[in-house]
Amino acid sequence: MTSPSVHSLTTPQIKNWHRSNISIFILLGMGFTAMATRMPLVKADLGVTASQLGLILLATGLGSLGGLNLVGWLIARWGTRLWILWMFPVFTLDVILGAVFVENHFTLGYVFTYVLSGFVMGMVDVANNVDGTALEKATNRILMPRMHAGYSIGTLIAAGWGALSSAIHLSLTLMLLPIVLAQLALPFMVHR
């Protein structure tokens, strides 16, 4: 990810950097969309009304505001790579914890996971965008649209998987397992 020596990178290193950035966007899209496909189940398991569920979903925005206010300072101090590699596992574990809370009818715990998810996802998203901007500068090419398309690919994958999981009545935890495994592989994908 970003470092003072980006201009001395080889072509294979630049390509790996680009693939890593796209992979992160794909996994962000998957992690964010996976639970959205199962909101009717979430609503039923938590025993909340539609308006109460709407209020729960606001928690993501509240968490995001906190993360977005910190991430600039953190990136300036430690760079993008550290925050992506540290925060992504937190995001991944938070997603699975949210499913466990839903399956155990623990509404307050689920709200907490949504606050944390917003906080962490906002930080990873900004760090990955800053990293993508550095890649564009290093290559003198416009690459960000392709990187952001990765997020859309991730949402499509997760939406399809979520719909299939719902049709075959997979639990939330089992539905999230392949996504979590893909996200936990992230440190092995993020390299130059």
Regions found by a protein language model. Name each.
Residues T173-H191:
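Symmetry-related core transmembrane helices of the 12-TM Major Facilitator Superfamily/SLC fold
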